[in-house]
Amino acid sequence: MRSLLLWIAVVVCLLCSVAAVVQSGSSDGFGKPRDTETAISFLEYKLMAPSVPMIPLTLIHGADSKGAVCLDGTLPGYHLDRGFGSGANSWLIQLEGGGWCNNHRSCVYRKTSRRGSSKFMEKALAFTGILSNRSEENPDFFNWNRIKLRYCDGASFSGDSQDESSQLFYRGQRIWQVAMEEFLSLGMKQANQALLSGCSAGGLASILHCDEFRELLPSSTKVKCLSDAGMFLDSVDVSGGHSLRNMFQGVVTVQNLQKDLSSTCTNHLDPTSCFFPQNLVSDIKTPMFLLNTAYDSWQIQESLAPPTADPGGIWKACKSDHSRCNSSQIQFFQEFRNQMLFAVNSFSNSDQNGLYINSCFAHCQTERQDTWFAQDSPQLNGKRVAESVGDWYFDRAKNVKAIDCPYPCDTTCHNLIFE
């Protein structure tokens, strides 16, 4: 009964958030009112069964003494479901997503939400998909120690600075470090297998921190990384501008990310370019799996056709429901898909890496049960996402790389429709 009540509370909370978002509009596409991540989260929770187990929030006590705090100065937190049986010494770390804040206004706003303060985080979260503890839902990782690290810094667990006047703490890198120390003390230092994963902004974080994660663990530990919906592209928007580049430039500058970015990249590119994964993935030494839809819903909503690039609302219907797009709009999406394939081309040449690019209009497929491992889940070459990730991680197959044919050929997609 307690789990059911918690589940209802989470859904009601998300519904209220979405209603507020829809009513208030947006002035900059990335600031206070619009929250595409919240809308996507709500759509995902609608698909969730009430019987899903709820995992309580744990705050990292003492983190504040190391300056590892959320945007508002509160303690960071995580949810841990302990492993059992053959998975007792295996660890999966899932980095939460939730966009970014790129200026004073948007960062101050996040202080009043779970994206910037543990005061507003759910006290328990449902573990589904790659976090599920049921073998029929998560065949390869169900009995591992599974952790979801909450996201409250606004810069993909990167950055180390402070805005004294507004009491804003940009401490993503410190949160990452203190969380890893906590997990190592809980037993991860004895892990025989480990997987660093993440969705959206967390998927970008898994790319940024992959090699660092490898270095934390003994050389005898099998370590790999998974980025779900983390391939954010430096693309031109529908107005010919660079909405996401402008956004990332603000994040890098405001949160002082320069020193945390890959020196291999910053030696020849500007810091903003080195926050884009397309300029990072080929240089990662640790085995990495990239999972992404070719028509990523978040990027369509917020990078390709944000309100600032479409003031007349010509793209509003199309970006909410791809079935309402005209032929020229679909062609624009096909060009975006081509950019995605070009961005992963060099990465895919490595035998140790894995790839799964399906032609769906979705965002984050590892934590949704319907897209991770269900009877009617999306498939590529007859494999569901969970099966492909498992084949790659456990070396059950060689060259685990699959790229879908262009839209509309894939009939297995679970596309997101924004009402």
From Swiss-Prot:
Keyword annotations from UniProtKB, A to Z: Cell wall, Cell wall biogenesis/degradation, Glycoprotein, Hydrolase, Secreted, Signal
GO BP terms in the entry: cell wall organization
Entry coiled-coil feature ranges: none
Enzyme Commission number(s) from the entry: 3.1.1.-
Entry-linked InterPro entries: PAE/NOTUM (IPR004963)
Subcellular location as annotated: Secreted, Cell wall
Signal peptide: 1-20
GO cellular component: extracellular region
Pfam families: PAE
GO molecular function: hydrolase activity
Glycosylation sites: 133, 326
Main localization, broad class: secreted
Enzyme class: hydrolase
Active site residues per record: 200, 296, 363
Family that this chain belongs to: Belongs to the pectinacetylesterase family.
Function noted in UniProt: Hydrolyzes acetyl esters in homogalacturonan regions of pectin. In type I primary cell wall, galacturonic acid residues of pectin can be acetylated at the O-2 and O-3 positions. Decreasing the degree of acetylation of pectin gels in vitro alters their physical properties.
Annotated protein name in UniProt: Pectin acetylesterase 6
Species whose genome carries this gene: Arabidopsis thaliana
Gene this chain is encoded by: PAE6
